[in-house]
Amino acid sequence: MINVLIVDDDAMVAELNRLYVARVPGFRCSGSASTLSQAQEMINDPQQEIDLVLLDVYMQQDSGLDLLPTIRESGRGIDVIMITSAADAATVQTAMHYGVVDYLIKPFQ
């Protein structure tokens, strides 16, 4: 089972992501966070089972990019998929530098 953490400050988008994850065999939503500090606490908690993070870039008070070093430094081998409207080259390059496994640009067609 792949345990997914959803990090998005938009409650509706987070819920849609949760519903989608629930429909995919072998995946389950292990939690969600609406702020980077909540996400950091979950990632740094060894009791939390997290294999994959679905991460937004544009959040009200933060940038999801700021969470990427925390994820890498945790040493837990957590994969990241960015799901965001941020389509500029610098943001994509920064995300790729930190080893995100995919970068999906909203809105989807």
For the regions a language model picked out, list residue spans one by one.
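Two-component/phosphorelay signaling modules centered on CheY-like receiver
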Residues: 2, 11-34
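Receiver (REC) domain active-site loop signature in two-component systems and cognate sites
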Residues: 59
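A Lys-centered signature of the CheY-like receiver
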Residues: 106-107
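Acidic catalytic/metal-coordinating carboxylates
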Residues: 35, 63-66
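Active-site residues of response regulator receiver
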Residues: 56, 84
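Short amphipathic alpha-helix used as the core "switch/output" element in two-component signaling
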Residues: 41, 65-77, 94
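Acidic, metal-coordinating helix/loop segments flanking the phosphotransfer/catalytic sites
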Residues: 32-52
